């Protein structure tokens, strides 16, 4: 397991979540907003899949939850 790769993926999940949150509350409307947010969520899914191959399913779920919690805290500030 590459600790730096796991950290990179968690950081990417945080960034994608924050981008989706901003897209939800931003000025875009309609289909463009939906497509933007969908793309961010799909990217999070890809990161989660990569985490599963690195650390296994249970640890990947924990890492995803930690990243989303951290991103939620940052987005709220």
Locate predicted features.
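Short A/G/S/P-biased low-complexity tracts
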Residues: 66-72
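Short, charge-rich amphipathic interface segments used for partner binding and complex assembly
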Residues: 36-66
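A charge-rich, low-complexity, intrinsically flexible signal that marks solvent-exposed coils, linkers
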Residues: 2, 73-75
């Amino acid at each position: 397991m590459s600790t730096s790769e796991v950290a990179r993926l968690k950081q990417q999940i945080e960034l994608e979540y924050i981008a989706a949150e901003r897209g939800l509350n931003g000025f875009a409307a309609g289909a463009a907003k939906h497509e933007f947010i969908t793309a961010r969520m799909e990217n999070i899914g890809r990161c989660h899949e990569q985490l599963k191959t690195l650390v296994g399913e249970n640890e990947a779920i924990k890492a995803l939850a930690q990243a989303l919690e951290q991103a939620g805290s940052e987005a709220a500030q």
